[in-house]
Amino acid sequence: MKQLQDEITQALTKLDGGSEFHEDSWERPEGGGGRSRVLRDGAIFEQAGVNFSEVWGSHLPPSILAQRPEAEGHGFYATGTSLVLHPRNPYVPTVHLNYRYFEAGPVWWFGGGADLTPYYPFAEDAAHFHQTLKLACDEHHPEYYPVFKRWCDEYFYLKHRDETRGVGGLFFDYQDGQGVLYRGPNPKGEAANYSNQVGEPASRDWEDLFSFIQGSGKAFLPAYVPIVERRHGMEYGDRQRNFQLYRRGRYVEFNLVYDRGTIFGLQTNGRTESILMSLPPLVRWEYGYQPEPNSPEAELYDTFLKPQDWSNWTANQ
């Protein structure tokens, strides 16, 4: 997890070229700590945060025990790396990544994923991101991507807005190598239905899953950096910037209302500055906003905030 943080921050520093990461090391009184790295006011990134944490304690919080009751009464160990990158140019999408590992008494599991949140509709960007993640998944199991992509669409969904947070990517949790792949809260959703059709894959051990996490983590830079390089030089005006700031509001809404990592961090007395590092530095809300018909903003709502089969997209569609 530390190595992933190192590799990503080094690459992002080089990519941005205008600022560097500032590191805060912190300790958690109940056990553990972490390193938070934040780049601010860069040439490309308005704010970029890449966190590593490793914490332990005497008992898991209610948000985890609700899903894994067999961990009740055991101490826990949790480690992970997470990032959120908020670019300055509205044509460059925001991106999020998180990979984590938990142990509690007799149980252990991996979780995580990566997802893309564009402000303007470029289908080739969404397709590149998905295709790169799918390749990393396919090296380990042919059903990882189809299940975890659907789970991502389900998880990064703002129920009160009836829209996805972006074009998705991968999301998974409670992966211990046993049972069906989907372990989420919606037994009647698309992810569960697909996972049930596939059935239980062959048992996978700790090393198999750790290798999958490593491969997915390494796929992040090739999935995202080419998109940044393609878009960050595009000219934009007040209209695009205002729309970006408005759409960033959805990011805030999701992270404060639904995000499991935020809730876990706050319930376990994590470092608040690190937990809320995912929030953008500038954001705006607007009462009753409606995009103009047939505009790029309307296309975002009509196509990009609904689940699509991005990995099979081709340029002539």
Swiss-Prot record:
<comment type="similarity">
    <text>Belongs to the aerobic coproporphyrinogen-III oxidase family.</text>
</comment>
<keyword id="KW-0627">Porphyrin biosynthesis</keyword>
<feature type="region of interest" description="Important for dimerization">
    <location>
        <begin position="38"/>
        <end position="47"/>
    </location>
</feature>
<feature type="binding site">
    <location>
        <position position="82"/>
    </location>
    <ligand>
        <name>substrate</name>
    </ligand>
</feature>
<comment type="pathway">
    <text>Porphyrin-containing compound metabolism; protoporphyrin-IX biosynthesis; protoporphyrinogen-IX from coproporphyrinogen-III (O2 route): step 1/1.</text>
</comment>
<feature type="binding site">
    <location>
        <begin position="98"/>
        <end position="100"/>
    </location>
    <ligand>
        <name>substrate</name>
    </ligand>
</feature>
<keyword id="KW-0560">Oxidoreductase</keyword>
<dbReference type="GO" id="GO:0006782">
    <property type="term" value="P:protoporphyrinogen IX biosynthetic process"/>
</dbReference>
<protein>
    <recommendedName>
        <fullName>Coproporphyrinogen-III oxidase, aerobic 1</fullName>
        <ecNumber>1.3.3.3</ecNumber>
    </recommendedName>
</protein>
<dbReference type="GO" id="GO:0042803">
    <property type="term" value="F:protein homodimerization activity"/>
</dbReference>
<dbReference type="InterPro" id="IPR036406">
    <property type="entry name" value="Coprogen_oxidase_aer_sf"/>
</dbReference>
<dbReference type="InterPro" id="IPR001260">
    <property type="entry name" value="Coprogen_oxidase_aer"/>
</dbReference>
<comment type="subunit">
    <text>Homodimer.</text>
</comment>
<feature type="active site" description="Proton donor">
    <location>
        <position position="96"/>
    </location>
</feature>
<dbReference type="GO" id="GO:0004109">
    <property type="term" value="F:coproporphyrinogen oxidase activity"/>
</dbReference>
<dbReference type="Pfam" id="PF01218">
    <property type="entry name" value="Coprogen_oxidas"/>
</dbReference>
<dbReference type="GO" id="GO:0005737">
    <property type="term" value="C:cytoplasm"/>
</dbReference>
<dbReference type="InterPro" id="IPR018375">
    <property type="entry name" value="Coprogen_oxidase_CS"/>
</dbReference>
<feature type="site" description="Important for dimerization">
    <location>
        <position position="160"/>
    </location>
</feature>
<comment type="function">
    <text>Key enzyme in heme biosynthesis. Catalyzes the oxidative decarboxylation of propionic acid side chains of rings A and B of coproporphyrinogen III.</text>
</comment>
<dbReference type="GO" id="GO:0015995">
    <property type="term" value="P:chlorophyll biosynthetic process"/>
</dbReference>
<keyword id="KW-0963">Cytoplasm</keyword>
<feature type="binding site">
    <location>
        <begin position="269"/>
        <end position="274"/>
    </location>
    <ligand>
        <name>substrate</name>
    </ligand>
</feature>
<feature type="region of interest" description="Important for dimerization">
    <location>
        <begin position="251"/>
        <end position="286"/>
    </location>
</feature>
